[in-house]
Amino acid sequence: MKNRILPILFILFFILPVQAKREPDLYKKADSQRMEHWVDSVFDSMSVKERIGQLFVLAVDVNTSAKNKELIRKYVEEYKVGGLLFTSGDVQKQAELTNYAQSLAKIPLMITMDGEWGLAMRLKNTTKFPINMTLGAIRNDSLIYAYGKEMGRQCRRMGIQVNFAP
C-alpha cells in the first residue's frame, strides 16, 4: 500500500502544480514567430539613441497649442521616446494629440495614462468610476471584472495601451 501512495503523492504535490502554472497559448506559433521577426528586425535597425529613447515614457499636457505640439514633436523625433503619458484635458484633444504623436513616430508609441478612477481622473466629460477603496469593499467578483473590462474598453477606444492604476 505504501508503494502506491508515494507515487500518487509525488504526482499530486510536484507534477500537477507545474501543469497548473502553464500559461495559455495566446498566439499561434506562426503569429509568435512573425511578431518576433518584426521585433528583431526593428530592434536591429535602431541606433543606440533610439534604443535608449524607447525606455522612456514622458508626460505631456493635453493641450493642442503649437507650443505643446512642438514639445511632442521634440520628444518623438529628437528624443525617440517609447511612449507618452497624457495628463488632464479632454477626450477630443487627447485623441488629436495621440494621432499626431503616432504620425511622427517611426515605431508605434506606447500611450499611457494614470487613471485609477478611469478616464475621468484625467479627462473631462468621461465616466468616473469608484475609487479603489470602494472597489475593495465590493464582494461581487463579476462586478469588479465588469468594471475592469469597461475601463479597458474605454482606454482602448482612446488608444491608451497602459493605465497606471493599481
Give the positions of each predicted feature.
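N-terminal targeting or signal-anchor segments and their processing/structural boundaries
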Residues: 19-35
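Enzymes and membrane/adaptor proteins characterized by extended Gly/Ser/Thr/Asp/Glu-rich
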Residues: 61-69, 73-166
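Alpha-helical transmembrane segments and their juxtamembrane interfaces
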Residues: 12-14, 55, 124
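Bacterial Sec-dependent N-terminal signal peptides
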Residues: 1-24
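Short, flexible, solvent-exposed loop/turn segments with mixed acidic/basic and small polar residues
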Residues: 4-5, 46-48, 71-77
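Mature N-terminal segment immediately following signal peptide/propeptide cleavage
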Residues: 31-64
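Short, structurally constrained coil/turn elements
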Residues: 14, 51, 104-105
